[in-house]
C-alpha cells in the first residue's frame, strides 16, 4: 500500500486522441443508439445533468425528443419534482392510456385549471369516476367566450355526435378518423367506458421527432435525481407514481455506505425502475454499486467546469482514466456506465465513449440553451444564462447540500464544492445537439466504428503532451468568424 502510494498515473481528455483506422463507415450512417438498461434505450448517447440550471421538464422534453434523456433535478419540493416528471410523460403519447377526465358536475374553473396546469387543450367528460362512461368532451373552443367559470361543465361541454374509436386503434387509423371529422382528440372506449385518448398533436410529434426516446407506451423517457436524505423514500415513491423511468441516486461520493444502502433499498422496492448510482471514479466503487443492485453507474469526481471538489477536497481521478477503470469493471457485469463531466467539445464526447462510456452526461454544454431553466442575463452586450454547480453555495442553500453529505449543516457552515457563473446563450437545444452529434459521427467515421459498441471495443488511443494539444487547436491565426461547434 505505502510503496504504491504514487504509482498511478491518470489521463484526461486533453491528454489523448483517438487513432484513425481503416473505415468504410460514412458519418451519416453511424448508429448512435445505446441501451443503458433493459428499459432505457436512447437514440443518442447524451443525458442532460440533474442540475437546477440545466434540467427541468422543458429540457427533459427537448432531450427526449432528440433521442436522449433528461434528469430532472431535485432542488425543489417533492410534489413539484413529481409534477415536472408528469409534464414530460404527458407531453407526448402514442396512445394516452390514462387520460385526465372530469365529470359533468365539476365546474368550468376546475377544467380550466387542469388544462392550464398540464397545457392540454381539452379533456374527456365521464358520467362518474367509477364507471367512466364517456358522456362528452370539453375543449378550448367550448371555453372561448365563457365569463362565469363557476358554471358546471355539463352546461358547455360537447355532448352530441361524439367521435370515438375502439381500444386497439392504431395511430394511422386514428389519424384518418381525426382528419375525416376535423377533430383534434379521439377518445378510445370499450363498452362505453373511457380507456384511452389519441390526439392529433401526438401524431404530429411522432412525425416531427421520429427518433425520440420513448417508453413501451409511446411516452417520452424521463429520469429524476434523488439523494440519500430523510425524504428520499417518499420522493422516490412520488416520482415512480408520476411515471419516472429512471431514478438517479446522485451524490458527490457514490462509494459510501449510505449510497450503497440506498441503492439496495431502491432496487428492492422498485425492481422495474432503472437505478443509476454515482458518482464514482474507481473500479472498486463501480463494483460495489453494481453488487448493491445498480443498473447503471455514473462516473466523474470533480471534472465539471463548475466543480471545485478537486481543489477544495484534493480528491478525484482525471476523467479518461476514471471512465476506463470503471468501464473495465462494468464489462464484467455486462452493465453500462455514464461519463459525467469535463466535456468541452464534441471530440471529448467520442473520447469518453471510446474509453468505455455508454453515454455522457452534459451540464455546461447544455446550460446555455433556450430550454435550460437558468435565468437569462445580459453582460457587456451579450446574452448569457446563469449556470452553477450543485456544490455551489446557492444550490446548497436551495437543497443540494445532502449531495455533499452536509444535510445537517446550516448555510453559514456549508463548505462549497462548486461555483456560480454564467455561460453564453446558445439558442435552441436541437442546434447544439446537432453539432455535438455531428462531431461524434465524424469521429466514428475516422475510427471505422459503425456503432457505439464497436467504438467502445475497438477504438485505440494515443497519448499526447502539451505540444500535441496546442497543435490540435487552431493556431498561428486570428479567428475572424466563430464556428458553431468551437470556442476556446
From Swiss-Prot:
Binding sites annotated in the UniProt record for NAD(+): 250, 300-302
Polar residues biased stretches: 475-488
Highest taxon, organism lineage: Bacteria
GO molecular function: IMP dehydrogenase activity; metal ion binding; nucleotide binding
Region (Disordered): 467-488
Binding site for IMP: 305, 340-342, 363-364, 387-391, 417
Involved pathway(s): Purine metabolism; XMP biosynthesis via de novo pathway; XMP from IMP: step 1/1
CDD domains hit by this protein: CBS_pair_IMPDH, IMPDH
Gene3D superfamilies: Aldolase class I
Activity control summary: Mycophenolic acid (MPA) is a non-competitive inhibitor that prevents formation of the closed enzyme conformation by binding to the same site as the amobile flap. In contrast, mizoribine monophosphate (MZP) is a competitive inhibitor that induces the closed conformation. MPA is a potent inhibitor of mammalian IMPDHs but a poor inhibitor of the bacterial enzymes. MZP is a more potent inhibitor of bacterial IMPDH.
Residues in CBS domain copies: 95-153, 157-213
Enzyme class per UniProt: oxidoreductase
Catalytic reaction equation(s): IMP + NAD(+) + H2O = XMP + NADH + H(+)
EC number of the protein: 1.1.1.205
Biological process according to GO: GMP biosynthetic process; GTP biosynthetic process
Xref: InterPro entries: Aldolase_TIM, CBS_dom, CBS_dom_sf, IMP_DH, IMP_DH/GMP_Rdtase_CS, IMP_DH_GMPRt
Record: residues binding K(+): 302, 304, 307, 471-473
SMART domains reported in the protein's UniProt record: CBS, IMPDH
Active site: 307 (thioimidate intermediate), 403 (proton acceptor)
Record keywords, A-Z: CBS domain, GMP biosynthesis, Metal-binding, NAD, Oxidoreductase, Potassium, Purine biosynthesis, Repeat
Family, similarity comment: Belongs to the IMPDH/GMPR family.
Task performed by this protein: Catalyzes the conversion of inosine 5'-phosphate (IMP) to xanthosine 5'-phosphate (XMP), the first committed and rate-limiting step in the de novo synthesis of guanine nucleotides, and therefore plays an important role in the regulation of cell growth.
Assembly behavior: Homotetramer.
Entries under NCBIfam families matching the protein: IMP_dehydrog (TIGR01302)
Descriptive protein name: Inosine-5'-monophosphate dehydrogenase
Organism: Staphylococcus haemolyticus (strain JCSC1435)
Amino acid at each position: 500500500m505505502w510503496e504504491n502510494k504514487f504509482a498511478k498515473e491518470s489521463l484526461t481528455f486533453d491528454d489523448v486522441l483517438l487513432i484513425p483506422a481503416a473505415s468504410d463507415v460514412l458519418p451519416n450512417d453511424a448508429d448512435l443508439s445505446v441501451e443503458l438498461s433493459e428499459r432505457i434505450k436512447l437514440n443518442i448517447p447524451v443525458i442532460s445533468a440533474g442540475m437546477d440550471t440545466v434540467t427541468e421538464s422543458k429540457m427533459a422534453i427537448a432531450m427526449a425528443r432528440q433521442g436522449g434523456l433528461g434528469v430532472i433535478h431535485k432542488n425543489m419540493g417533492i410534489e413539484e419534482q413529481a409534477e415536472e416528471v408528469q409534464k414530460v410523460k404527458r407531453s407526448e403519447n402514442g396512445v394516452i392510456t390514462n387520460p385526465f377526465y372530469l365529470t359533468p358536475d365539476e365546474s368550468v374553473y376546475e377544467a380550466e385549471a387542469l388544462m392550464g396546469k398540464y397545457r392540454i387543450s381539452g379533456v374527456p367528460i365521464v358520467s362518474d369516476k367509477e364507471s367512466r362512461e364517456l358522456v362528452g368532451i370539453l375543449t378550448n373552443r367550448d371555453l372561448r367566450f365563457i365569463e362565469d367559470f363557476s358554471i358546471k361543465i355539463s352546461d358547455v361541454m360537447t355532448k352530441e355526435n361524439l367521435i370515438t374509436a375502439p381500444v386497439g386503434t392504431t395511430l394511422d387509423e386514428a389519424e384518418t378518423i381525426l382528419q375525416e371529422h376535423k377533430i383534434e382528440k379521439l377518445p378510445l372506449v370499450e363498452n362505453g367506458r373511457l380507456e384511452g385518448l389519441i390526439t392529433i398533436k401526438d401524431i404530429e410529434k411522432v412525425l416531427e421527432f421520429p427518433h425520440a426516446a420513448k417508453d413501451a407506451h409511446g411516452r417520452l423517457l424521463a429520469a429524476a435525481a434523488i439523494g440519500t436524505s430523510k425524504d428520499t423514500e417518499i420522493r422516490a415513491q412520488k416520482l415512480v407514481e408520476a411515471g419516472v423511468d429512471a431514478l438517479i441516486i446522485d451524490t458527490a461520493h457514490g462509494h459510501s455506505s449510505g449510497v450503497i444502502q440506498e441503492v439496495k433499498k431502491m432496487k428492492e422496492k422498485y425492481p422495474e425502475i432503472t437505478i443509476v448510482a454515482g458518482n464514482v471514479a474507481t473500479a472498486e466503487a463501480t463494483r460495489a454499486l453494481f453488487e448493491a443492485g445498480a443498473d447503471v453507474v455514473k462516473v466523474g469526481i470533480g471534472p465539471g467546469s463548475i466543480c471545485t471538489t478537486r481543489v477544495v477536497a484534493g480528491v478525484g481521478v482525471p476523467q479518461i482514466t476514471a471512465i476506463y477503470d470503471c468501464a473495465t469493471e462494468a464489462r464484467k457485469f455486462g452493465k453500462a456506465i455514464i461519463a459525467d463531466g469535463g466535456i468541452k467539445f464534441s471530440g471529448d464526447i467520442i473520447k469518453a465513449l471510446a474509453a468505455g462510456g455508454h453515454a455522457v452526461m452534459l451540464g455546461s454544454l447544455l446550460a446555455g440553451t433556450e430550454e435550460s431553466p437558468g435565468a437569462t442575463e445580459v453582460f457587456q452586450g451579450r446574452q448569457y444564462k446563469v449556470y452553477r454547480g450543485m456544490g455551489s453555495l446557492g444550490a446548497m442553500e436551495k437543497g443540494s447540500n445532502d449531495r455533499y453529505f452536509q444535510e445537517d449543516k446550516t448555510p453559514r457552515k456549508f463548505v462549497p464544492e462548486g461555483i456560480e457563473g454564467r455561460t453564453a446563450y446558445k439558442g435552441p437545444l436541437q442546434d447544439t445537439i446537432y453539432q455535438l452529434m455531428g462531431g461524434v459521427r465524424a469521429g466514428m467515421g475516422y475510427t471505422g466504428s459503425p456503432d457505439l459498441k464497436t467504438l467502445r471495443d475497438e477504438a485505440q488511443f494515443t497519448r499526447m503532451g502539451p505540444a500535441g494539444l496546442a497543435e490540435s487547436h487552431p493556431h498561428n491565426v486570428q479567428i475572424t468568424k466563430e464556428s458553431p461547434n468551437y470556442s476556446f
